[in-house]
């Protein structure tokens, strides 16, 4: 058993209480410090069996029989006496003043040590100083206290030092509060572990002024306690451990012994330099503790915390030639058991305050909620090197890595070493207590007179439950060590988890939040700590959260795959948007340009504006939905889960409304194409059944405009009111035709044949005419209504392509033109002009007919004068779209006889006269013109006598079915339809020309005959 201790005295100067932070100023002289440390003691056990007595037991880990001897060349009176049988050893050494001021810095768990270069005095020791000043003028007394193996109590410090510590005791709390605090902090360790380890006591003491006594084992009123141990990697861990846990034991006996032994030598050690002696002794400790030959069992120490007292335990922990003044405050009821891989996390968490240089202090919460702690030392390297290995801590093992150590301040030749530490916490399952194995000298609190303390079971249970809940979170934490940088990447991001359960802020324990009742810590120390914390956290914030970010971020491969998928979906969405956009433009183009199939005359101005507005509305809605889908795809929503991008429904609704309205508005439009046939030839176009089907589906308005020149001659023939060929069946579905069809129960004109239309002629109707003759009452009605709105129309044909609406308006300006519409076809161009007064229209026809417009003469004719004709008794074709006004011409002039308006009628009359003798003879002039038309192959050779079955009147069919169902209620609908089919077959395949009553009778007869069979 070997132990070394250093006594620090300073009778002239006072050390400032700055919350554990030393200031290298006038109030602090680092050269006047005495350290109390252990050289051969590897572990300490705080044992309080049966509550009888508080004791601090230490077990010697080093098993070397040879003890390191400090070189006497630089230490005049330094000597190490090691004796396992003796209880005390004294060494006195004299060292010279160092060249550079001894500053220290605690930078992210890394101690920077200043020392001057010199030769290594002893190859068996690890010297942290490379050189010492040759002049040694200070004397330091080193005391080795080798305590008995059975245990020596250290609990009577307050009574022995009462006389000399009067001033100090006034600033602290009273004895009662200290005893209560001490009794709550300590607990008996298990008897099993107490038997396996030897006990020794390593205390830190400091005399600040001439009137001070030794305060051993824990809380020093002047906050100048010193903590030190053999294994160098464990010193830093021990510092934090002592700060957080404040191991409270009774130190009266040890205090008495130390006081009796050291009081005679107090005055001698006033002005002695402690740094050199300390580091010489520390080298020996480092060598023994890290020697490969020492493989002793690590002792365990039971640590409990319950209540923080008003006095702050300030321990001066030194590493190398740096002395760290630490305030150790305890958190109530924090006795817990840690897994072995939790201690480093807890220890590193508290020391996240990194100072770049100068005096600094360890954080007060070095080990938050500490329980069982085991400190392992680093193995000694084979040969001395200024580079001391650092520790890379994993879950259950420490890995030695090379690292360089440097000092922050000092001479340029100084070599620095930074020795990292490793803390491995192991949980000791004990129902009564939590035991921590500590391989270093533990700082124990002074000013405590209690003999023993018992930690309540509730405190232990509560803390255990808290730690068990956090075990899963800390299980996988791995840490790496970099030179002069942070120990743990996840250190700062785990602050909240490692905070005490009672901490309202959730962060590690600090002096600010652990103030005992009635007392407060030094405000300067708190402010200084805050400054250091802020500076270091800003500097290392990126590294602190690096581990957490790496765990949360998926692999690079997954990221690339996701990006490619999103990119592909965005491309597909863009394609859909472009297709919909083009589709809208295509529909717009069809409506604007492809008017021949719809037989409509699109007004250039108003129609285009309305259609353009509808198109813009559809495109705007399309773009809005496209942007919404694009944003969702960017958020990671699969495209297949989103609604498709389509504009069909909205597009159709917008354009269908527009088209239907446009068709009604254009009912007044003109078909002046036939007026230009005087010196022109019509194209030879046959009647197409597909066109008939299209016309039947379009439900034409009777007043719809005449198509352009290229329209089928069928429509031209149908414009004759005397040539009814039954096309009214195409518009029987129209609501406007109900009044016409309700007048008769006949199916079509049942008293006549379908192709044998009634040609009841009058002298007026058969007279030669210039224009078309609308015979349908609906046509007349709509024409009159339209005439009231738009006035009277004239047809201007033969326009050249260069004629514009402005040209026509300028030529017809004096006639007060209300509206102008220009229509184009493949080979013909014409215009329709509306006038408010009939007189203006007639005057325009007379004056402007034959006038040249842009170099080409035009033909002008009046097309509508309502009320100048009477309708025939029968309805004419529903496809007749002419609104032309009848101009009676009694002159049988050849030119008049050859008018285009009589060509279809004459041709129809000729065909009918050849087939049926019922027709009266026609005028010779008309026949001549018809023969000319026939020879020119202008009209088809066959009459229009075929009507497809699907064009039958659905309303008449409904009536027939209703009557047959009433007459034959027991017969199904299918049989009734079969009967109608038989009637149609028997009537040469047509029901046209038969009345509804006749059809019903014939179908009923067939059904009765079928029933009889």
Swiss-Prot record:
Record key words, sorted: Cytoplasm, Phosphoprotein, RNA-binding
Comp. bias regions, Basic and acidic residues: 56-76
GO MF entries: protein homodimerization activity; RNA binding
Source organism per UniProt: Mus musculus (Mouse)
Tissue specificity comment: Highly expressed in testis. Also expressed in other tissues at lower level.
Subunit structure: Homodimer. Interacts with TEX14.
InterPro entries reported for this sequence: Nucleotide-bd_a/b_plait_sf, RBD_domain_sf, RRM_dom, TTC3/DZIP3/RBM44-like_helical
GO cellular component: cytoplasm; intercellular bridge
Function: Component of intercellular bridges during meiosis. Intercellular bridges are evolutionarily conserved structures that connect differentiating germ cells. Not required for fertility.
Domain RRM: 792-865
Source organism, top-level taxon: Eukaryota
Taxonomic lineage of the native organism: Eukaryota, Metazoa, Chordata, Craniata, Vertebrata
Chain's gene name: Rbm44
UniProt subcellular location: Cytoplasm
Record protein name field: RNA-binding protein 44
Repeat among keywords: no
